[in-house]
Amino acid sequence: ARLKDYEVWLRQKNGKWNTISTYMRTLRAVYNRVCPPGSAEYRPKLFDGVYTRVVSQTKRSLTEDQMRMLLTTDLASLPQDVQRALAYFRLMFFFRGMPFIDLAYLRQQDIQGNSIVYCRHKTGQQMTVRVPKEAQSLLKEYRSKHPDSVYLFPILDETVKDDAELYACYLRALRHFNKGLEKMTALLLPDVKVSSYTARHTWATLAFYQGLLIGVISKALGHSSIKVTETYLKPFENEKVDNANDDLIVSIVRFKERKDYKYLAVQKRFIGIPLLTK
């Protein structure tokens, strides 16, 4: 009942259904860790009455040109808070669309050679991501400088040990990060909405347009199933099909034009008109 009350409260605060679903699924993941399925305390139907589905939305990713601008803009030309927000955004993109929560919870020990080995906060799935050369200078510049720091980046409060308090700390950091992204877009991409989800959706979408198989994209994102990935990409599949349809029509029309040209050339030869050649 309290979970349902929380859902109602979120709706009263104008929360979107996908946002509510994210909160509920995050709570469910935490609950499953504290009370694993099969334990005496576990209640299998605890989340049955609340919204945990994902609705396919209009596209939330950037175009290739927009992403290129964010990757090539000189960070030194931006205000300090925007510099860090854009640096984290770039790293999330370079790390195969890593969610901000996973970036925030990364630990120093997760760096193994030239890779990051970590468990996704949402699913517990282990991920291994190679650090590309484009990310190495950012990683060096923005990682925690404190020698005894547990976390790779100075996002979470080192002194907080309680899981619930640490998650509250993460939510504050997330709000601060999104505000930094708002300032960034006001400066670099006016009228474009960018949030913490955008790096992940952009990576998936651009990979899709590059021709990567959905199964490969799903594995790269650490999705629990291909269906989740299809939800990410559904708004873009119609666009891709429409573009393919345009290409098909153009190729057929041009083929007809080529045939008509050849027919005309034959006719000209037949009636004795010289054929102009290039």
Model-derived regions: residue spans:
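Short, polar N-cap/turn motifs at the start of nucleic acid-interacting alpha helices
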Residues: 109-115, 190-193, 212-231, 256, ...
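Conserved tyrosine-mediated DNA breakage-rejoining catalytic core shared by Y-recombinases
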Residues: 95, 105-141
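DNA breakage-rejoining catalytic core of tyrosine-based enzymes
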Residues: 53-72, 125-132, 147-150
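DNA/chromatin major-groove-contacting recognition/catalytic segments
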Residues: 128-133, 137, 142, 234-278
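N-terminal core-binding DNA-recognition domain of tyrosine recombinases/integrases
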Residues: 1-58, 73-77
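Short, basic (Lys/Arg/His-rich) helix/loop patches that form interaction surfaces
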Residues: 77-80, 148, 178-219
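Catalytic-site neighborhood detector that most strongly recognizes the C-terminal catalytic loop/helix
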Residues: 61, 120-124, 159, 221-246
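Active-site/catalytic core of tyrosine-dependent DNA strand-transfer enzymes
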Residues: 67, 132-191, 272
